[in-house]
């Protein structure tokens, strides 16, 4: 009976150790995914800002052309 108890405790202990290792790897993967998502979001906002600047310049150029035509 003592042999069965020791075997059972050993199996449970090894199971808990492997479970904790899996949880640790899972948390690390989630952190990596969060970092990648944050980096992608930053790149997207930079692209939006760059596009917004271009649109402002184009609108400003057309606005100044319209003012020149009104003066003539």
From Swiss-Prot:
Q: Please indicate if the UniProt record lists Nuclease as a keyword.
A: no
- Leader peptide range in chain numbering: 1-22
Is Translocase among this UniProt entry's keywords? no
Q: Which residues form the propeptide?
A: 23-49, 69-72
Which GO MF terms are attached to this record?
lipid binding
Bias (Basic and acidic residues) occurs at 38-47
Q: Which GO terms describe its biological process?
A: defense response to bacterium; defense response to fungus; killing of cells of another organism
Maturation and modification: C-terminal amidation enhances antibacterial activity. This increase may be due to stabilization of the alpha-helical structure at the membrane interface.
- Mind telling me which GO cellular component terms the entry cites? extracellular region; membrane; other organism cell membrane
Looking up InterPro entries in the UniProt record yields: Frog_antimicrobial_propeptide, FSAP
What is the protein's major site of localization?
Answer: secreted
Please give the tissue specificity annotation from the record for this chain.
Answer: Expressed by the skin dorsal glands.
Q: Which UniProt keywords apply?
A: Amidation, Amphibian defense peptide, Antibiotic, Antimicrobial, Cleavage on pair of basic residues, Fungicide, Lipid-binding, Membrane, Secreted, Signal, Target cell membrane, Target membrane
Q: Where is it localised?
A: Secreted; Target cell membrane
One matching Pfam family, short form?
FSAP_sig_propep
Outline the segment boundaries, as ranges, of region: Disordered. 27-47
Q: In the record, which positions carry Leucine amide?
A: 65
Kindly give any further remark recorded in the entry: The primary structure of the mature peptide is identical to that of aurein-2.5 from Ranoidea raniformis (AC P69018).
The record's subunit annotation is: May be monomeric or may oligomerize as homodimers or homotrimers in Gram-positive and Gram-negative bacteria mimetic membranes.
User: In UniProt terms, what function does this protein have?
Assistant: Amphipathic alpha-helical antimicrobial peptide with moderate to potent activity against Gram-positive bacteria, Gram-negative bacteria and fungi. Also shows a weak activity against biofilm of both Gram-positive and Gram-negative bacteria. Probably acts by disturbing membrane functions with its amphipathic structure. Kills fungi via membranolytic action. Enhanced sterol levels in lipid composition membranes reduce interaction of this peptide with membranes, having a protective effect against the lytic ability of the peptide. Shows anticancer activity.
| Similarity remark | Belongs to the frog skin active peptide (FSAP) family. Aurein subfamily.
Q: What is this protein called?
A: Aurein-2.5
- Origin organism is Ranoidea aurea
Taxonomy, top ranks, is:
Eukaryota, Metazoa, Chordata, Craniata, Vertebrata
């Amino acid at each position: 009976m003592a042999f069965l108890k020791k075997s059972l405790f050993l199996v449970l202990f090894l199971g808990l150790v492997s479970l904790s290792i899996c949880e640790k790897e899972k948390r690390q993967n989630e952190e990596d995914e969060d970092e990648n998502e944050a980096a992608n979001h930053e790149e997207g906002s930079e692209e939006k800002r760059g596009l917004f600047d271009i649109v402002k310049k184009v609108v400003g150029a057309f606005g100044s052309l319209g003012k020149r035509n009104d003066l003539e």
